[in-house]
Amino acid sequence: MIFSTLEHILTHISFSVVSIVITIHLITLLVDEIIGLYDSLEKGMMTTFFCITGLLMTRWIYLRYLPLSNLYESLIFLSWSFSIIHMVPYFKKYKNYLKAITAPSAIFTQGFATSGLLTEMHQSEILVPALQSHWLMMHVSMMVLGYAALLCGSLLSLALLVITFRKFISIFSKSNNFVNESFSLGEIQYVREKNNLLPNTSFLSSRNYYRFQLIQQLDLWSYRIISLGFIFLTIGILSGAVWANEAWGSYWNWDPKETWAFITWTLFSIYLHTRTNKNFESVNSAIVASMGFLIIWICYFGVNLLGIGLHSYGSFTLTSN
């Protein structure tokens, strides 16, 4: 009873704090002058991290195994992973380009985990024999950490694409306006020369220079965090294969979860390969990474929604009242 009450309190505190963090972040986007709000945002995410850590530890002590056996527990761990990713740049004294992604991701996963859809999973249950293994901690924790990092990297790539295409549309629009005005004067050759100089002129402006710097930083951070997530995902898949051999007598069975995990791994392998090719532009690799956002969610939720395959533990069904 005490553990259940403490878990309930920590869940609501963490959700409330991260909601306040989102509100503070929105205020800082509108009012840049309020510097004190930036510190409040970081302290809020630290509070969220410690609350979720306390929640996981409480459930671990109560259940006597790392709480990663169903969708509810893995979502809580995913939210915890987002909070860790948020704090790494802060302690490294880097400019945090991830905070616009990690904080909303934490609140959405936390909100879904505590929603009425997963109420039945809040209660403790005895693990099925296949899950009573030390590989549970290794395999599932690495997979969820990999999902969190890859999701953040994919969202950064999506942001890069949005900013890049907005820049191209803006330049194209200005170019067309200039061409129309120049054609009315009949200066065709002059238009061609000015048209070639237009991108350079736009680049030299302070606004476009800042945008260029932002694109470069988004590209760098997406590459870093996707590389980290790919390592976690690889370790998770390999440890899962060893566990599968112990539990089912085969390293790989091509059930839905394993198939989509392989698709996810292959997609991000392609992304990392494109990064080694200097002829490949950052936009092209960002397109590959952004595709991974959808693939990860299919891999993560697909089996739980369908409730099929060898990995259907902790699946849930949507029921109407």
Curated annotation (Swiss-Prot):
It is found in: Plastid, Chloroplast thylakoid membrane. Coiled coil: none annotated. It comes from the Eukaryota. One of its GO terms (molecular function) is heme binding. GO terms for cellular component: chloroplast thylakoid membrane; plasma membrane. It is a multi-pass membrane protein. The chain crosses the membrane at residues 17-37, 46-63, 71-91, 98-118, 143-163, 225-245, 259-273, 286-306. GO terms for biological process: cytochrome complex assembly. Keywords: Chloroplast, Cytochrome c-type biogenesis, Membrane, Plastid, Thylakoid, Transmembrane, Transmembrane helix. May interact with Ccs1. Required during biogenesis of c-type cytochromes (cytochrome c6 and cytochrome f) at the step of heme attachment. Belongs to the CcmF/CycK/Ccl1/NrfE/CcsA family. This is Cytochrome c biogenesis protein CcsA.
